């Protein structure tokens, strides 16, 4: 992994969270630590205060519940992914992507995860065109109003059992668009995700590792 890659942050135990929070464009800092579901990995905090925080090249950023994305000061790694798909899906897992109002960076990285360098299909993971052929929906983008209905219809078209994966900071929290008038995230109040892959955009290796993990392949 490129040493310059901004992966899992190393937040010192003595970090001034209020000071770091004053720099953050997405309000990722709180009294609990740094929320990787909000962080866009811009690196401003690390550039301004390298004595408090730095980003390591560790690309294992995904977790299986939203609250696990909050890293406390002094915490060195994220909890391991414990969720596992049923055995019937551990050798073949089909994903339908819905791009819901994002910038297309996460979509490009998701597509790159299937190229010759990362080859996600070697683990039996396929990205399919029809929701009727899918086992899961992988959501990218903050969910704008114009895509809310299409997202819901796509989800309804996926046969049971089905799973929801949130890929990228925008999908997880709304990212830089959180709270905007054009955003409608009501869908996520009704359906729970089994996997959260942060990043702006999410790196192909983070995507591959995360999905392979819930298949019991990593």
What residues fall within each predicted segment?
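Iron-sulfur cluster-binding cysteine motifs and their immediate structural context
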Residues: 11, 18-63
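Cofactor-cradling patches in redox/metallo enzymes
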Residues: 108-110, 115-118, 124-209
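Flanking helices and flexible, charged tails adjoining ferredoxin-like Fe-S electron-transfer domains
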Residues: 46-131
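Flexible, acidic/Gly-rich N-terminal and inter-domain linker regions that tether
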Residues: 1-10
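C-terminal alpha-helix
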Residues: 210-218
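Ferredoxin-type iron-sulfur electron-transfer modules in oxidoreductases and energy-metabolism complexes
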Residues: 27, 33, 160, 182-183, ...
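Fold-independent oxyanion-binding glycine-rich loops
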Residues: 1, 14, 56-58, 98-100, ...
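Cysteine-cluster motifs in flexible loop/terminal segments that predominantly coordinate metals
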Residues: 16-20, 102-103
């Amino acid at each position: 992994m490129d040493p310059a890659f901004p992966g899992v942050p190393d937040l010192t135990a003595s970090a001034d969270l209020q000071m770091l929070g004053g720099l953050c464009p997405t309000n990722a800092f709180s009294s609990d630590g740094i929320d990787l579901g909000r962080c866009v990995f811009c690196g401003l905090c690390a550039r301004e205060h390298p004595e408090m925080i730095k980003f390591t090249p560790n690309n294992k950023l995904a977790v299986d519940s939203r609250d696990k994305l909050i890293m406390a000061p002094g915490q060195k790694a994220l909890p391991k992914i414990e969720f596992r798909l049923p055995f019937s899906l551990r050798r073949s897992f089909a994903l339908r992507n819905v791009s819901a109002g994002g910038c297309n960076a996460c979509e490009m990285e998701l597509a790159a995860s299937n190229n010759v360098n990362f080859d996600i299909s070697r683990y039996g993971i396929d990205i399919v065109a029809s929701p009727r052929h899918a086992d899961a929906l992988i959501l990218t983008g903050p969910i704008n109003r114009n895509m809310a209905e299409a997202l819901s219809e796509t989800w309804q078209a996926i046969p049971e059992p089905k799973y929801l994966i949130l890929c990228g900071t925008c999908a997880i929290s709304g990212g830089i668009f959180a709270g905007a008038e054009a955003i409608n995230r009501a869908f996520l109040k009704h359906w729970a995700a089994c996997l959260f892959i942060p990043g702006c955009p999410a790196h192909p290796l983070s995507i591959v590792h995360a999905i392979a993990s819930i298949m019991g392949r990593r």
